[in-house]
Design a protein with these regions (language model features):
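Short beta-strand/loop motif that positions the catalytic acidic residue
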Residues: 270-272
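Alpha/beta-hydrolase fold nucleophile elbow
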Residues: 129-140
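Short beta-strand element of the alpha/beta-hydrolase
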Residues: 54-62
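N-terminal cap/lid segment of alpha/beta-hydrolase-fold proteins
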Residues: 25-49
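Conserved alpha/beta-hydrolase
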Residues: 74-100
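Alpha/beta-hydrolase active-site loop
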Residues: 106-126
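Active-site glycine-rich loops that stabilize anionic/oxyanionic intermediates
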Residues: 61-65, 274
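Alpha/beta-hydrolase-fold enzymes
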Residues: 146-233
C-alpha cells in the first residue's frame, strides 16, 4: 500500500490493489481519526468505487466484531457504485489499544461517545462529497447506535438500514442495569462477568432444536459461525463497562421522548433473519 494524508491530518493507508467483480473496480483505503473520547484512535475503512459514486453507505458494526468483517458486502456495494465507510467502535477491532481493551469503552459517556464517533466519521466524508445521498447501516448493537444517531443527527441522513435490531422489556433492562452497576462496584468496570453474559445472551440458542456452539444463533450457516469463533477480534467477553454502554443505548432509544425525535422524513429499512433472537 501507499501512504498519504487526509484533510483531518490523520495518516491514510491506501491499498494499491484494486478489486474487480461483477461490476466496477474498488479501491480500499484505511485511515485513523481521533475518537471524541480524546484518548483512542478510530480505525476507519473506505471502500471507494472507481466510477461515478451513486450513494454513500456508512456501517455501524455489531457487538464483538469490527468493520472489516463487512468487507464482502462493502466491496459488492462499491462495485455497484456505492462508496462505503465505517469505523471500529471503541472497544472493538483496532480502536482497542490491546486485548484487555476489547469490550471496554474507555472514557465513554455511555453510548453518546460511540454515536458521536459515528458522526465524526460522517462529517469526515460528507465534507468531501456533500451532495451525494448518504445512508447509515447499523447491525445488531450497531443498529441500536444507529437509532440513537437518528435521534441526534438524523437530519444528516437520506435514509437508514437497521439490521437485526430489537428492544428489551423495561423491567428486564432495569434489572440488567442494576446488576451491571452492582457488579462494577465490587469487581470493577474491567471485569468480565459470566453472569452478565448469561443474562444478555443465555436464551438466544434455546429456540433451536440442536446446537453446536454457544453462537449458533448468529447464523444458520455453520461456516459463518466457525469463522466468527476462529477470529480473535470476535466473540470476546464484554466487560461490565461494555454492558453498561449497551444497556445505556437500549434505555435511550426506548424512551418515548427520544423516539419522538426520530426524523419522520428519513426513510428506514428494517432487515432481520427469520429466526433472529435479537
Amino acid at each position: 500500500f501507499k501512504r498519504g494524508r487526509v484533510e483531518s491530518g490523520c495518516e491514510l493507508m491506501m491499498y494499491d490493489e484494486k478489486r474487480t467483480g461483477g461490476a466496477g473496480m474498488v479501491e480500499k483505503e484505511e485511515f485513523y481519526l481521533n475518537s471524541t473520547n480524546g484518548v483512542n484512535k478510530l480505525h476507519v475503512i473506505l471502500w471507494h468505487p472507481l466510477e461515478e459514486i451513486r450513494a454513500i453507505v456508512q456501517i455501524s458494526h455489531g457487538m464483538c466484531e469490527y468493520v472489516d468483517r463487512y468487507d464482502r458486502l462493502a466491496t459488492f456495494l462499491a462495485q455497484h457504485g456505492m462508496m462505503v465507510i465505517g469505523n471500529d467502535h471503541l472497544g472493538h477491532g483496532e480502536a482497542a489499544k490491546g486485548e484487555e481493551e476489547l469490550g471496554y469503552f474507555p472514557k465513554a459517556k455511555g453510548s453518546e461517545t460511540v454515536v458521536d464517533d459515528l458522526y465524526k466519521v460522517t462529517k469526515s466524508i460528507r465534507a468531501r462529497y456533500p451532495r451525494i445521498p448518504y445512508f447509515l447501516l447499523g447491525h445488531s448493537m450497531g443498529s441500536f447506535m444507529a437509532r440513537r444517531y437518528l435521534m441526534t443527527y438524523g437530519s444528516q441522513l437520506d435514509g437508514a438500514i437497521l439490521m437485526g435490531t430489537g428492544s428489551q422489556p423495561p423491567a428486564l433492562l432495569s434489572a440488567a442495569k442494576t446488576t451491571a452497576n452492582s457488579l462494577s462496584v465490587v469487581r470493577g468496570e474491567h471485569h468480565r462477568s459470566q453472569l452478565m453474559m448469561k443474562m444478555a445472551f443465555g436464551s438466544y440458542n434455546k429456540q433451536y432444536p440442536s446446537v453446536r456452539t454457544e453462537y449458533d444463533w448468529l447464523s444458520r450457516n455453520d461456516a459463518n459461525v466457525d469463522t466468527y469463533l476462529e477470529d480473535p477480534y470476535c466473540g470476546f467477553m464484554f466487560t461490565l463497562n461494555g454492558y453498561k454502554v449497551l444497556f445505556d443505548v437500549l434505555s435511550f432509544i426506548q424512551e418515548p421522548a427520544h423516539i419522538g425525535k426520530l426524523p419522520k422524513e428519513v426513510p428506514l429499512l428494517f432487515v432481520a433473519g427469520s429466526d433472529d433472537p435479537v
